[in-house]
Amino acid sequence: MEWDERPGSNDVPTPVMVDVGDHALCAQVRGKGPTVVLDCGGSGQGIGGWGEDLERTLAERATVLTYDRAGVGRSGGSQARTVAEMADDLHRLLHALHLELPAVFVGWSYGGLVTQLYATRHPSDVAGLIFVDPTASGTPPGSALVRDLSFLLAPRLLRLRAIFGGTNAQPLRELAVTLTGMQNAMREVAQARQESGLPPVPIRVITAGRRPRMPKTHLEHLNADHHALADQSPHGQMMVAERASHQIPFEQPEIISQAVDEVLSLPPNSQEDLNR
């Protein structure tokens, strides 16, 4: 597949549909250099979901891939039932596009779960991992009954909002599907980390410095998981986006650029050694 490299053509690249088997994924590639994969949070509408400033900055030094997950945005198929299916979809997409591997994977929020599963299933594809305020894996603290009711009611409220959502109707319905399977996704990733662990590549975990009010036990659970992610590698580090809430790509995008630069600056032979 060829990309238009004429001056100015890479400013707003045209998304393409890429066959990954029984469906096609909508993907956007911009820039030149080593591959950086941005895996978005929410329902998984990744094209345009990271903010133009961040994508443009990263594309000055890397080949940047964004994409919509199956059944989301402009991608075909149905929304995946498991995180492993999402990770394998991304694996097929990267190889279909013939992008340079190993790549640096950047997962924001729910995308952090996808990139973790990707790393456990396809470690040779991974040169580095950057988690942007990732969703915590495992089982959150508190009452199981309250937790189950919350994950039951939230998708229903989103679907109700979608009835009057106008242009936001589709993303709201897609997010409802994601939340319906959220508890299973968090358990799935926790189990994969326990069984396989992440590859010993450089890891940066960027945590939000401005959090909404939440129970102390939930905050402790979130912080503990972020530190545990960084500790998965001898080359892991925590970073705090002091000025940002969960919306780090929009409120403090420079800290993501810094993390990518740190990982990309490692000599190629060091990354190869880490992947062995």
Which ranges hold each PLM region?
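Catalytic active-site module of serine/aspartate enzymes centered on a nucleophile-bearing elbow/loop
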Residues: 234-276
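Conserved HGGG/HGGXW glycine-rich cap/lid loop of the alpha/beta-hydrolase fold
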Residues: 18-76, 260
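Flexible "cap/lid" loop of the alpha/beta hydrolase fold
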Residues: 129-162
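Active-site loop/oxyanion-hole signature of alpha/beta-hydrolase fold enzymes
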Residues: 66-106
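Conserved serine/cysteine hydrolase catalytic core
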Residues: 165-244
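N-terminal cap/lid segment of alpha/beta-hydrolase-fold proteins
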Residues: 4-24
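Active-site loop/turn elements of alpha/beta-hydrolase fold enzymes
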Residues: 69-72, 77, 134, 208-210, ...
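Conserved hydrolase catalytic core segment
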Residues: 101-140
